[in-house]
Amino acid sequence: MATVLFQKTNERYTDQNEVSAFLASRGVLYEQWDVSKLPAELVDTYTLTDADKQTILDTFQSEITDVSERRGYQTADIISLSDATPNLDELLVNFQKEHHHTDDEVRFIVSGHGVFAIQDDEVGYYNIELNPGDLISVPVNTRHYFTLQEDRKVVAVRIFVTTDGWVPIYEKDPIETAN
């Protein structure tokens, strides 16, 4: 279950009703999907073959189809990051640059953990700390960045409006990220 950490105050929301209400008030879609149906051999597996990735997509196809039909998404893929990922640190540098997209940024956490830090005019930056089973959709044109938690591992389903995939728009100088 996700938590929300406010970077300015270090206040943290852990109650799921509070988390859901806050994210909804910011236009962030938040859902929880059942990860217990993931095949046992893929739980906490971060080096994935193409067949493994397809198995994950197939396992969650009904959920992917449901959210896609509701929100106009067209395609999905799998990203897996861990210390075994070539050039992990360079990838994280790109993800940690503040950016936005011309479509929603949708992620479902299958294994591991991730953090989306979202810029908000009212509360400043807040971190959405994601765990297995959490799905979020960062709204179009919302400034944010992504990083990993201390375990430096995540497997996520990425869902896109177009087949262009992840297309960041950088407009500002890099910011110092806070976890």
Curated annotation (Swiss-Prot):
Ni(2+) binds at H99, H101, E105, H144. Its EC number is 1.13.11.54, 1.13.11.53. The record marks D104 as: May play a role in transmitting local conformational changes. It catalyses: 1,2-dihydroxy-5-(methylsulfanyl)pent-1-en-3-one + O2 = 3-(methylsulfanyl)propanoate + CO + formate + 2 H(+); 1,2-dihydroxy-5-(methylsulfanyl)pent-1-en-3-one + O2 = 4-methylsulfanyl-2-oxobutanoate + formate + 2 H(+). GO terms for biological process: L-methionine salvage from methylthioadenosine; L-methionine salvage from S-adenosylmethionine. Pathway: Amino-acid biosynthesis; L-methionine biosynthesis via salvage pathway; L-methionine from S-methyl-5-thio-alpha-D-ribose 1-phosphate: step 5/6. Catalyzes 2 different reactions between oxygen and the acireductone 1,2-dihydroxy-3-keto-5-methylthiopentene (DHK-MTPene) depending upon the metal bound in the active site. Fe-containing acireductone dioxygenase (Fe-ARD) produces formate and 2-keto-4-methylthiobutyrate (KMTB), the alpha-ketoacid precursor of methionine in the methionine recycle pathway. Ni-containing acireductone dioxygenase (Ni-ARD) produces methylthiopropionate, carbon monoxide and formate, and does not lie on the methionine recycle pathway. This is Acireductone dioxygenase. It comes from Exiguobacterium sibiricum (strain DSM 17290 / CCUG 55495 / CIP 109462 / JCM 13490 / 255-15).
